[in-house]
């Protein structure tokens, strides 16, 4: 049987990937401070994120409706179609994570609860139960043919596999030498390779991702949709998942491709949060103040063109004047020169 052991994460990951964790951790700390200072701005982001998360996670699985209809469902409308019932179930589970994350942990009961919440109105027999028969992960090719992408754990071995997965996760989570942002994607790979349900595995995995991020101290999923990012880059997401599941049954798989993909998605979420925050918080500011705020709030070096893109109503002349003044006042530093020049808050 598959062995679940994450001790390799102590020293088995390339150093350049380890550095990414430090960047993401800094971004997270920065936004925790922002959140206390700009409550209303983050509340607007929260309202937007719940819609995008519900839409994105279900859309990946071909479960769709209009954005307006999703808004109606979130506000209490009665679901009519099969898809709307599944969408509403995901919304309820996601809301539970956002409101009760301090009282939730990744466990067998919580995993089954998420599945039950999603499926009870469309498939009450299977809802909240592990798969009753073996299943395959299929891929539909452009020419209409099918191929088996992965052969998951058998139905009669699922309960034990989930138990061993959870024990390995608990053990690794307590080990201070194991970066939790490496542990989360490894857990997701293993969960999806087990594929414990006949339907809904992908959506449950995304709920677990958001919950595990909360547990690790990252509430990014409350303000920026992780599911939306996965949906927008789902080809690379599934390619990385397939690479990291190759050799899984023989304990020979390499988690690195999926770890890298996960960190890229997380970084994009923080970048989007930074941009969204600027859009909301700078609406009423003077043009020169908006340019300065963009520069001071940037989490990575940005170019003049980047500033123009963020502030299309601000003239190039105004941007250049602010840049020159901030350089003179030593508020920012210049990296590179001429067309490749980028600017960053001075440390």
Q: Where is each model-derived feature located?
A:
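FIC/Doc superfamily catalytic core
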Residues: 1-347
């Amino acid at each position: 049987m598959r062995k679940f052991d994450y001790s390799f994460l102590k020293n088995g990951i390339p150093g350049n990937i380890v550095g990414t964790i430090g960047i993401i951790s800094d971004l997270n700390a920065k936004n925790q401070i922002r959140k206390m200072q700009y409550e209303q701005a983050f509340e607007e982001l929260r309202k937007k994120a719940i819609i995008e998360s519900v839409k994105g996670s279900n859309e990946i699985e071909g479960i769709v409706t209009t954005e307006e209809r999703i808004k109606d469902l979130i506000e209490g409308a009665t679901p009519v179609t099969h898809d709307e019932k599944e969408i509403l179930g995901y919304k309820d589970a996601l809301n539970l994570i956002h409101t009760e994350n301090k009282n939730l942990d990744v466990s067998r009961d919580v995993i089954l609860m998420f599945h039950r919440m999603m499926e009870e109105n469309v498939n009450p027999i299977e809802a909240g139960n592990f798969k009753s028969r073996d299943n395959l992960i299929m891929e539909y090719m452009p020419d209409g043919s099918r191929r088996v992408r992965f052969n998951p754990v058998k139905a009669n071995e699922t309960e034990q596999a989930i138990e061993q997965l959870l024990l390995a996760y608990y053990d690794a989570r307590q080990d201070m030498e194991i970066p939790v942002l490496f542990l989360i994607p490894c857990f997701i790979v293993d969960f999806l390779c087990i594929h414990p349900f006949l339907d809904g595995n992908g959506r449950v995995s995304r709920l677990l991702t958001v919950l595990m991020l909360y547990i690790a101290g990252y509430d990014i999923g409350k303000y920026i949709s992780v599911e939306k990012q996965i949906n927008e880059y789902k080809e690379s997401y599934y390619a990385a998942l397939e690479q990291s599941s190759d050799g899984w049954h023989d304990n020979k798989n390499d988690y690195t491709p999926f770890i890298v993909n996960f960190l890229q998605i997380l970084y994009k979420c923080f970048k989007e949060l930074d941009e969204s925050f600027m859009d909301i918080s700078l609406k009423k500011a003077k043009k020169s103040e908006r340019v300065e705020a963009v520069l001071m709030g940037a989490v990575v070096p940005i170019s003049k063109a980047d500033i123009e893109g963020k502030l299309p109503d601000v003239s190039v002349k105004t941007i250049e004047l602010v840049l020159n003044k901030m350089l003179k006042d030593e508020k920012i530093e210049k990296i590179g020169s001429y067309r490749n020049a980028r600017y960053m808050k001075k440390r």
